[in-house]
Each structure stands twice: as structure tokens, then as C-alpha cells.
Amino acid sequence: ATPSGAIIVSLGSEYAGLFSNDDQLSKQILNAGEKVEEKLWRMPLHKNYDKLMNSKNADMQNINYVGGAGSTTAAQFLQRFILNKTPWAHLDIAGMAFSKYGGALNSGGATGFGVRLLNQLIDENYE
């Protein structure tokens, strides 16, 4: 999923963004991606980005009006809904979801990015 599409500015169409509050989970996801050749880059997720979601009119806003860090702010928005430090991860696949030129698995269009990665992650760590 892609809450903002802003990850494309950072990573283009070569890597998907990985946001997580847990180093072990991040390592598992990165390893799974490497094995199936679906590239990820871990992006920052930090409480300092919270101030970008402060609102004068509501509990919070889901957009960063200051500018910059759009994908990180979107992931930090998701973080606000995680209870009790539950390990979680978000794959921002905006740059990887479609391919004009195709690749090893398709001739163009929707790529299915993340399906093999998540299958590998589950096979290695959760079955």
C-alpha cells in the first residue's frame, strides 16, 4: 500500500520503502525481500515526525503541510494507531506496484510486488 505516493520521490522505482517500529521484524522482512529479489529500503520512523501531524482543529491531521518527508509522515500517522508497542511494518510500494517496462515476472503493468516477499516471510518465520 502507499498512503501518500511520496516514497517515489525518495526511492523511485527500484526499491519499496519499509517502515517498522521493530528491528527484528525489519530484518526478517529485508531478508525475505532479498531472497525473492524484491528490494526494500528501511526508512525512518521516529516520534520527532509526530509534530508534523499536529492540528489546531482536530486530534491530528493526516497530511504534512510543512512539506517534505511525506512518506515518513504517512507512516508515522499509522504508528499513532499502534497500541502497546506492538511490532508492525508497512511496505510502501508506490514505486514498485506498476512497471512500464516489465521484468522477470511480467511484461508491464501491475507487478504483484510484495506477494513473493510476504510468502517468503511467512514461510521462514511464522509457520
Language-model-derived ranges and their functions:
Residues 1-127:
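A generic structural signal for tightly packed, nonpolar segments enriched in small/aliphatic residues
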